[in-house]
Amino acid sequence: MCGCERTPILVQSNRRDHDDNQIHKQSVRHRVHWRMCPNNRALRQPEFGTDALEHHCSEGFYAGACGYVGVEKDNGIVLMLPEYDLVVIGSGPAGQKAAIAAAKVRKNVAVIDRTPMIGGVSVHTGTIPSKTIREAIFQLTGRAVKAQYGNGHVAHGDISVRDVSVRVREIIERETDVVRVQLRRNGISIYQGLALFLDPHTLTVRDGEDGHQLKAKNILIACGTRPAHSPEIPFDDHRIVDTDHLHGLSGLPRETIVVGAGVVGLEYASFMAALGSRVTLVDQRPIILDFVDQEIVQALSYHLRQLGITFRLGEKVTRVSMDMQREFAFAELESGKKIQGDALVYAVGRQGNADHLHLEAAGLVADPRGRVKVNELFQTAVPHIYAAGDVIGFPALASTSMEQGRLAACHMFGIPFEHMPELFPYGIYTIPEISMVGQTEETLTSTKVPYEVGIARYSELAKSMMLGDHMGMLKLLFHRDTHKLLGVHALGQRATEIIHIGQAVLFYNGLVDYFRDMVFNYPTLAEAYKVAALNGLNRL
């Protein structure tokens, strides 16, 4: 049973004179502060003036050490507020890395998260769940095994949403434990509740009716995003859902409508199709993934159609509705078409959570999409307040968010650092997955760079045959005259893994000749680099 006590921070001021500049003697009634753990019990903070001691309840919610600052009220009561070198709003990838980087240089750090389960959107509704769903589908449906041993092989019987959800919950719990242990090990305090600015250095943390205040020398806004909602969409979290509430589906829909063909929409469309649902994907844009090399996009589109996905591109959804019995969802298109499905997944954009923080009290303002503007050092218009992660917009990747958070902490505490690299890989976890780093054919053509292409088909690689992947490919782009590597694009199994070989060569301005001249393990997918390099160099 949790033995934490609920004790407010109050210090009675014993005034000896009326000189405001006089340092007044204080008789301390309580020198601990409290906050709620998930079972509505509280956590005791280490005694005032102690070193980085720790306390945690049986549920694992953790309190580290901090300093205190006195704030005097009109009635003579001095409220002793916990004061931190850094308070991080959000415990996702950006918040985690910033908090740990600051703690490593002996700074007092606190993390505020509005949910009982730390880890942010990335762990609970975003990156980790979606990628776990993908891997669970591969395992439960036996897709890779069937490719190797034929359709007669069945790895699992009928696949249900429950089967997938069990695995997702297991991974989420493990990742949450990893984050909690990392923060605890580094002496970082964790607060549960909604963070609101009172002034540029003061935050209040509200958990239901309870609330308490924190002072911070530096603040990092890393509160992430949520699915964008249109007021015309009648969400019910069962038949019409956003991507954060797919778990609300009672079973696998026979027919699914996915509105939005961005990265998230494409990923979930491919997941549902791989499970056997007939998917219609609707987007008002004429093409998908316009930032990706279009040869890769065309190959991906072909394979998605092979999964059974129907594309309705260049079509705007004008109305979404349900029937009277709430058994079917309907999407009406501007062209007059009406699509029926057992479920509709709305995947049109994300909305930043900064619009819930009372930014105006800190002298800041969020844009209409709830995002915060920052400079190249991740500072907002108020220099001691930083922002990182999805809440600042593009590129909104878990990988880049981690580095943004770390760099923000480095700058605020004078830790030597390099600026955010311009070169980073994208991974899109559709079935099949794709990844890219560097330039595309379209950008090289528009900038009039003389380039050549080298391609390796997975069907040429022994390893891919063993894995049952006949459809993948690796594409290298390099300068015709200097042979400098310019871009790397991959489609197929482990594309998001092998892309990093190309990333390293690109970063060091390497030549495509490197792949030709190096010896790779055999059989491996990495061998595709040598095959693609030879293919491209033989075209010169």
Predicted features, each with a name:
Residues 87-89, 195, 213-224, 259, ...:
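Short hydrophobic core segments
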Residues 89-94, 98, 103-115, 121, ...:
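Flexible, glycine-rich terminal cap/loop adjacent to redox cofactors
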